Each structure stands twice: as C-alpha cells, then as structure tokens.
Amino acid sequence: MELATESIEGVLLVDKPQGRTSFSLIRSLVRLIGVKKIGHAGTLDPFATGVMVMLIGRKFTRLSDIMLFEDKEYAAVAHLGTTTDTYDCDGKIVGRSKKVPTMDEVLTCTSYFQGEIQQVPPMFSAKKVQGKKLYEYARQGLSIERRFATVTVNLRLVKYEYPRLHFVVQCSKGTYIRSIAHELGNMLGCGAYLEELRRLRSGSFSIDQCIDGNLLDEPEFNVSPYLRDANGLILQPAPVL
C-alpha cells in the first residue's frame, strides 16, 4: 500500500472490468493508496467496461462537475428480438419477437440518431423525480411519468448480423445508450436490449490511456507513474535512460 501523502493526487484512467461496479473500483483505490478524497467523471453499469476517470485529491475532485459534462464515446451491441425491463442484459425479459429486420430497415433506423434527439430516461436509472431515484419506483412496480431530455448523438453502424447490431456512438452528457438500443428495437418492430457496452472515450481521455482496473486489487501496485493532470499529461514521466 502506498503512503497517503499530498503527492498522491491526479487523474487515474482505469479500464473498468466487466462485472465490477464503479464504486468497488473506487473502494479498491482507497484501500490501495489510503486517500479517501476520490471522485469520478461518470460511472458505468456493472456489465459495462471501459474508461473510468478517477479523480484523486481535493484539487482534482473539484473537477468532477466539469468533466461530467464532457462528451463520451461508446462501442455497443444491441440484441434484437428481445426486450428487458431495464433495457439491458441485466434485466428481466419482458418480450420476444420473431421479426428479423432487413439491413435497409436497420440503416434507416440508425440514421435517426444523428444530432439532437429527444430521449426519455429509463425507469431503471438513477435519474431523480420528486426527490427519488427512478429505479426505486421501478423496484416497487411503479412507472413514473418522465420528461423528455434533449441530447446530442452521432451513431455509426459497425456491423449487423441478426440478432446483434454493433454500433459506435458519440454523445453528450445524460445520454442513455440502453435507451438508444431500446428505441432502435421499437423502431425496427422487434424490440431490443443493450447486450454489451464499452466506453471508448470520456472527454479527452481514451481507452488506450487506461490501466487494467484489476490492478487496483494488487497490494503492491504503484499508481504514481500513471497519474495525469487535467489535460492528460503524465505527472511523473518515466526517467530517460
């Protein structure tokens, strides 16, 4: 375990493993470095992987609100023909369809997700309505009226092999990728849920800058060489040999 000193501060870019919660990674980092002042620039669902921006120390946790507003980029897979109550692979199956959309239909529907669109947050989300998170209502079997939100997206179809539709999307803050998968399913008339999600970029930070999140569970792992400033520059560059 590293000694908790004022020098342990900065931005740590982590590739979140599948199956881990975002907060379990934060807890692992707290245990590893002994610094409790740790924030983030956006969480990921347990089934998702990819860029998690961890902010260590008061100087950097103050940047959280700014970084949360930055655009993000995701690679995703929508599973057609099945719908779930959460719009993703962790939910309960609530519908099935035998319809197999054509490529022309897929191209037409995916072209809708360009520029500003109106999106309704899913019931199984942390969005608050009347001071209560939507998923708390959902777990009680309640469906609450939600307001449309305007978000900006740029979706690119990568591959379509039924039942899987692969796409990459750049989006603004507050965009729900599983809602995009759900809406695609509705537009195609077959239903869909989000099967895979990988965050490729958060603001200016990309996946190729990240360390494996499992390293945070290694007691002797030294995070210092991987700490960056707010612009992504390494704070302690490796010495030139």
Swiss-Prot record:
Residue ranges of the TM segments: none
GO biological process terms, semicolon-separated: mRNA pseudouridine synthesis; tRNA pseudouridine synthesis
Active site (UniProt): D45 (nucleophile)
One function term, GO molecular function aspect: RNA binding
tRNA processing found in the keyword field: yes
Keyword Iron: no
Alphabetic keyword roster: Isomerase, tRNA processing
Reactions this protein catalyses: uridine(55) in tRNA = pseudouridine(55) in tRNA
Listed EC numbers: 5.4.99.25
Enzyme category, top tier: isomerase
NCBIfam families, A to Z: TruB
Family: Belongs to the pseudouridine synthase TruB family. Type 1 subfamily.
Described function: Responsible for synthesis of pseudouridine from uracil-55 in the psi GC loop of transfer RNAs.
Name this protein carries in UniProt: tRNA pseudouridine synthase B
Natural source organism: Chlamydia trachomatis serovar L2 (strain ATCC VR-902B / DSM 19102 / 434/Bu)
